[in-house]
């Protein structure tokens, strides 16, 4: 389970950040399109549930940044096969995942990472995650408080060096720490009972009560 939903638990559980989120994209070419020579910055947003992902706010923020004069090409895809999502990931500069995430890197951001494309991710967990996740288990993304989403998107638009470096770190993370073989090895340790003490999480330690898909005002 995750520390972000620990408020619903009573017994200690395995922190899933210790295990990882494997993604096998070996069936698709991991080619990359270098768009540095292109005039516009290509941003991809692919919400599975637009309301829960904060899509209306994300689109409003991007429109605001366009109004500032930034050359943005927004690609929004919904209800398309995964092969189409992967195709678009290869052609974008970065992705905007969602606004209310309980993890720095959910599935869409992890797929982007395989292509070396960084993700902007919003979530209330961003400011407290270091209290509940060991540093080596934190996947690289620009994970920010929902109120900071505009500044985060703007940073990846203007700071090309940072954007590319973050994409490289994300790619290294998913190809090593979250590689299917590495995650399977950790699952085998669970099955055999060879469980390190620091994999366990006590729900009594959690102070985070927000949760994915819900604005802070709705939890009060």
Listing of model-derived features with the role each one plays in the protein:
Residues 1-18, 25, 60:
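A short, active-site helix/loop in glycosyltransferases that binds the activated sugar's phosphate group
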Residues 17-53, 59:
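Conserved donor-binding/catalytic core segment of Leloir-type glycosyltransferases
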Residues 77-88, 100-105, 109:
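Conserved active-site histidine-acidic residue motif and adjacent donor-binding/catalytic loop
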Residues 86, 109-114, 128-129, 133-134:
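Short alpha-helical segment that forms part of, or immediately flanks, the ligand-binding pocket
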Residues 90-104, 117-118:
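Acidic donor-binding loop of glycosyltransferase active sites
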Residues 118-125:
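Short hydrophobic beta-strand element within catalytic cores of glycosyltransferases
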Residues 161-199:
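A charged, aromatic-enriched C-terminal amphipathic alpha-helix characteristic of glycosyltransferases
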């Amino acid at each position: 389970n995750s520390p972000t939903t620990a408020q619903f638990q009573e017994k200690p559980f395995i922190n899933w950040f210790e295990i990882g989120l494997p993604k096998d994209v070996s069936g698709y070419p991991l080619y990359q399109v270098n768009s540095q020579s292109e005039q516009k910055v290509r941003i991809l947003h692919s919400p599975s549930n637009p309301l829960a992902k904060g899509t209306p706010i994300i689109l409003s923020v991007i429109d605001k940044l366009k109004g500032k004069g930034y050359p943005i090409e927004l690609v929004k895809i919904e209800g398309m096969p995964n092969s189409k999502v992967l195709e678009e990931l290869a052609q974008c500069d970065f992705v905007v995942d969602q606004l209310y995430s309980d993890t720095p890197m959910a599935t869409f951001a992890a797929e982007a990472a395989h292509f070396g494309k960084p993700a902007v991710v919003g979530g209330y967990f961003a400011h407290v995650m270091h209290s509940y996740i060991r540093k080596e288990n934190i996947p690289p993304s620009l994970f920010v408080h929902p109120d900071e989403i505009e500044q985060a998107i703007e940073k990846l638009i203007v700071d090309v060096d940072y954007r590319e470096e973050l994409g490289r770190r994300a790619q290294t993370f998913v190809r090593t720490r979250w590689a299917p073989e590495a995650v399977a090895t950790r699952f085998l340790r669970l099955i055999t009972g060879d469980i390190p003490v620091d994999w366990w999480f006590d729900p009594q330690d959690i102070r985070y009560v927000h949760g994915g898909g819900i604005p802070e005002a709705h939890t009060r």
